[in-house]
């Protein structure tokens, strides 16, 4: 098994590490803001509540959706011949990413309220993809690569755009300069690697199989 074959899993892990890492750094660990925090935090910002700044709250969860669906799309693709342990690891990453869509202190009743419809739908979609991942492996290369590209593109665009929109307000709230943390850049790097592998990795492997 070539190291290159594991770059899909590595890309997913890098994306999650960046997403869970600091997006706005602070000397006090309790004031560090991660990508995962933002989906809840923006609800309480005065400028967002007043409508002065417009953000799509659920957009901050797109990296989780991209990682989860991406791992499910690739885990059983025949050209890579992943061992069962490797497939299990990729699907475990997919499940962990999906479950991180749950809000803090969630309950089944709370997840059925309009505020969390999209998150509930995202979890259901991601877990369904895990369940049918052997079938997803039969999709043509170009459809898989295009889907990965779309997912990762949205996972960069929505969170980064809206984070930069609210960054001045968060900095004012925390009374410091709003220094960007490493998490944002690592997440973007992981998603870019995923896209690159989606086209070059899948295409090269499947050409060899056809040959």
Show the residue positions of the predicted features:
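Compact integral membrane and secretory-pathway proteins
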Residues: 1-211
């Amino acid at each position: 098994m070539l190291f290159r074959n594991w770059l899909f899993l590595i890309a997913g892990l890098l994306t999650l590490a960046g997403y869970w890492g600091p997006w706005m750094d602070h000397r006090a660990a309790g004031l560090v803001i991660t990508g995962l925090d933002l989906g809840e935090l923006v609800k309480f910002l005065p400028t967002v509540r007043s409508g002065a700044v417009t953000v799509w709250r659920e957009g901050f969860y797109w990296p989780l959706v991209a990682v989860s669906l991406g791992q499910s799309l690739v885990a059983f693709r025949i050209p890579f011949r992943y061992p069962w342990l490797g497939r299990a690891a990729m699907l475990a990453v997919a499940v962990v990413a999906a479950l991180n869509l749950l809000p803090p202190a969630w309950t089944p009743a709370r997840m059925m309220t309009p505020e969390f419809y999209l998150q509930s739908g995202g979890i259901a979609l991601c877990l369904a993809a895990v369940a049918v991942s052997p079938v997803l492996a039969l999709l043509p290369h170009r459809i898989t690569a295009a889907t990965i590209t779309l997912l990762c593109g949205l996972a960069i665009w929505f969170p980064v755009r809206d984070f930069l929109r609210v960054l001045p307000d968060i900095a004012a709230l925390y009374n410091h300069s709003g220094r960007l943390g490493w998490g944002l850049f690592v997440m973007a790097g992981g998603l870019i690697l995923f896209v690159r592998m989606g086209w070059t990795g899948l295409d090269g492997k499947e050409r060899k199989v056809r040959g």
